[in-house]
Amino acid sequence: MIFAFDLFEPYEFQFFRNGLIVSTIAGALCGLLGVFVILRGMSYIGHGLSHAVFGGAAASAVMKVNYFLGAGIWGVVSGLLIARVARRRVIGADAAIGVVTTASFALGLALMNRYGQASKSIEAVLFGSVLGVKVADIYAVSLVAFLGLAVVVLGYRKLLFSTFDRDVAQVSNVRVSLVEAVLLAMISLTILVTMRVIGTLLISALLVIPAASARMTTNSFSRLLWVSPIIGAVTCFFGMNLSYHLDTSASATIILLDAIVFIIVYAIAGTRNRAKMASLGHL
């Protein structure tokens, strides 16, 4: 009975319940969009856009503008700007990400240093804070999750073509630039609604690790789209619970749990591959 009481103790607190709901939905959402991040070789995009959104969050705090409105517009504009610069091919996509996001992050730091009263809220954005999660965050992450699911379901074929063969997609009358812009906008919105719990410094890991783990379990694109969200949601759920009982940062615990899952899947996949190679050697 004591163990059961301790196990369910955090559920007595409203802030924990809010954080658990937001993080679990966010884990599934990041897992879903992370599939495209991994397959498109855009692992750096999550890291970059999280830094860009930080600039918007800092500006919103300083100007006392609604967080979702200010940081959301900033993040989406940054994503679209990256896509536009990259399409011109004057510089590569990685360079475009570096220029736009580091400039935005630097602006955020400058604002934070100039207006010290905003430092506490900015620190929460950087590292995440389950205490700052409100009911409004639940609505926000649920809305973005619904939009993300709608984009994937309605644009499944276009996303599939543009992800695996950009040239074939263009020949097939798929507006690749529009698809990429929508995807970047969705990633920006996902980062925005997830920052409260995970923080900007670790959000990119939540976009990459669950999808990378899922990628080692299947070669099917359709299976990836449900395996990755499951991994993301489960690790966020248990990570939140562990963080309370271990008295550790929620974001750090979630990412460490994701990393453990990745290591386990990697070890199992490696063992299976060696077994297959050994069986072929006996033929």
Residue spans for each PLM region:
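Membrane-interfacial amphipathic/re-entrant helices at transmembrane-helix boundaries
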Residues: M1-A28, K276, H282
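Cytosolic-side transmembrane-helix boundaries in multi-pass membrane proteins
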Residues: F8, T248-L283
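Helix-loop-helix "hairpin" substructures at the membrane interface of multi-pass membrane proteins
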Residues: D137-P210
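Transmembrane helix-bundle core of multi-pass membrane transporters
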Residues: F3-N18, R89, I97-R157
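Small-residue-rich segments of transmembrane alpha-helices in multi-pass membrane proteins
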Residues: A52-V62, V100-L111, G132, V176-M186, ...
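Loop-to-transmembrane alpha-helix initiation sites
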Residues: G19-V22, Y67-G75, D94-G98, V141-S142, ...
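Transmembrane alpha-helical segments in multi-pass inner-membrane proteins
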Residues: V197, L201-A252
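Short loop segments and helix-boundary regions at transmembrane helix junctions
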Residues: V35-A118, A214-W226, S243-L246, A269-T271
